[in-house]
C-alpha cells in the first residue's frame, strides 16, 4: 500500500517520539513468523512497556536521526521490527529473546543502549530494578552474616589463647 507524504511524516514523527523516550532499542527480522505469534508478541510488548513497530527502512532511518539510536541506521535492511523499551532497558531484548526461543524464524539484527550498539543477549540479561535491589540486599545480608561469623570466631580464638 502506497503511503502519501503526510502519512510518512506521521510515521516518522511517531517512531521518533518513541525513540526519544526509550531507554533501549532492539531490531529484529520477523520474516516467516505466523500472524498469531506476532499478535501474541505485540500483546506481550504492551504488557511489558515495549513499543513495537514494523516500519519501512527509509522511514526508520529518518526516525532515529538525532536520537540515541542513530547507530542502528545501517541495520535497517530487509523487513525490520523495531522495539523500544520504555520502562526497563532490557525489556525489549528479553521479550525478543524469549520470542526467538519459540519461533526459529525470528532473529535479532541489533540492539542499542545509550547511543551504542550492544549485544542483545547482554541487554536481555540486565536485571530489573526489583531484581537489582534483591541482589544488593542479598549481598548486604551475606556480608553482615559473614562478618558476624568472623567476629565470633575471633572471640573464640581469643578465649582459647587466654585459656592456654
Curated annotation (Swiss-Prot):
CDD domains: Ribosomal_L10. The keyword Membrane does not apply. The keyword rRNA-binding applies. GO terms for molecular function: large ribosomal subunit rRNA binding. It comes from the Bacteria. GO terms for cellular component: ribonucleoprotein complex; ribosome. Belongs to the universal ribosomal protein uL10 family. Forms part of the ribosomal stalk, playing a central role in the interaction of the ribosome with GTP-bound translation factors. This is Large ribosomal subunit protein uL10. It comes from Photobacterium profundum (strain SS9).
Amino acid at each position: 500500500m502506497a503511503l502519501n507524504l503526510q502519512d510518512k511524516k506521521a510515521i516518522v514523527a511517531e517512531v521518533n517520539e518513541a525513540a526519544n523516550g526509550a531507554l533501549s532499542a532492539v531490531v529484529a527480522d520477523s520474516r516467516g513468523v505466523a500472524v498469531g505469534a506476532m499478535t501474541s508478541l505485540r500483546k506481550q510488548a504492551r504488557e511489558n512497556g515495549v513499543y513495537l513497530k514494523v516500519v519501512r527502512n527509509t522511514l526508520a532511518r529518518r526516525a532515529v536521526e538525532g536520537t540515541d539510536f542513530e547507530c542502528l541506521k545501517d541495520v535497517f535492511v530487509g523487513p525490520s521490527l523495531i522495539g523500544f523499551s520504555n520502562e526497563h532497558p532490557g525489556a525489549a531484548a528479553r521479550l525478543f529473546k524469549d520470542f526467538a526461543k519459540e519461533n526459529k524464524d525470528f532473529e535479532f539484527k541489533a540492539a542499542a543502549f545509550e547511543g551504542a550498539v550492544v549485544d542483545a543477549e547482554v541487554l536481555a540479561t540486565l536485571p530489573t530494578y526489583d531484581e537489582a535491589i534483591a541482589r544488593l540486599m542479598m549481598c548486604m545480608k551475606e556480608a553482615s552474616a559473614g562478618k558476624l561469623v568472623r567476629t565470633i570466631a575471633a572471640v573464640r580464638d581469643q578465649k582459647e589463647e587466654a585459656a592456654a
